[in-house]
Amino acid sequence: MRGKCALLYHCCTMRVVYVLLLGEMSGMSFEIGLAQTVHPKDGDVVGMVKRYAEQARMYGVDLLVFPEALMTPFEKTPEEYRAIAEPVGGAFSQAIAEYAKRYGIWILYTMLEEAPEGKQPYNTAVLVDDKGKIQTTYRKTHLFDTDTIQESERITPGENLHIPTATPFGKIGIGICYDLRFPELARNAALEGCDVMIYTAAWLDGPRKADHWKSLLRARAIENEFFVVGLSRCDSGYLGRSLIVNPFGEVIEETGPIMDLVVATIDLEEVAEARAAMPVLDHVRNDLY
């Protein structure tokens, strides 16, 4: 049986949505929290992370996810990006690692990672465990160069796909925003054993943007028969509307364009159930493509 019940919690800083997905819970489930944020007016991003971590711990979250462009707004010059960037493990990373350890939760966040001298920084996702130890990083590989924005003016692209990371709650795959439009990244993660694919994003609002966001997230879940999580920031001009899709392509939680902490129970047995019913990955023709 698949379904849900919801408890809404309102406070002055954020709205918390708690969703329980009904089914057989046998140690294969975990709590995921999506921190749909805006940049704080006072610029205290670390303080904001602390507040979300405190709330997440109250709701028993195992993995707390923050959106793309957490460290600083996108709307800065290339020179400002280079000045803000830090190495992974620098002061920004250390502060978040401390909160992960203090509240006993895993945290996935993004930062501007220093690149070799003369290069623009990387747009990097970092996964830190509940002991404050960095378990994996991923540098965004597909940069958003379009008719209106040239991300490559600010960011250096990564050169490697993310290999799903083993955690106490399954193998976690990571993509960043525009990566969602490239199904090869998700398929590679699936073939590497991914259970939950997380896209952390600053998805722009505008014509067709919401439809593309939802359709692409559902498609990635259906194609690969794993959970897909899409988290977008919700500042002015950005979409918000974060959602979670199960391995059958069903949207099991979706929020609006406001600050939220969405907490959901993900049952990994649904991955095995979907793949047993229709073993798509077993039918991939690697000899042809």
Give a label for each model feature.
Residues 29-41, 65, 124, 137, ...:
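Active-site-proximal beta-strand elements of phosphoester/diester hydrolases
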Residues 5:
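Cationic, low-complexity basic patches in intrinsically disordered or flexible, solvent-exposed regions
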Residues 9-27:
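Short, Lys/Arg-enriched N-terminal segments with co-localized hydrophobic residues
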Residues 88-108, 171, 181-262:
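CN hydrolase (nitrilase-like) catalytic-core segments centered on the catalytic cysteine
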Residues 41-46, 50-131, 137, 204-222:
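Cys-nucleophile CN-hydrolase/nitrilase-fold catalytic domain and related Cys-dependent amidase chemistry
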Residues 272-289:
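A short C-terminal boundary segment appended to hydrolase-like catalytic domains
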Residues 33, 126-128, 243, 262:
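Conserved hydrophobic/aromatic positions in well-ordered beta-strands
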Residues 116-192, 205-215, 219, 277-280:
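Active-site catalytic loop in hydrolytic enzyme cores
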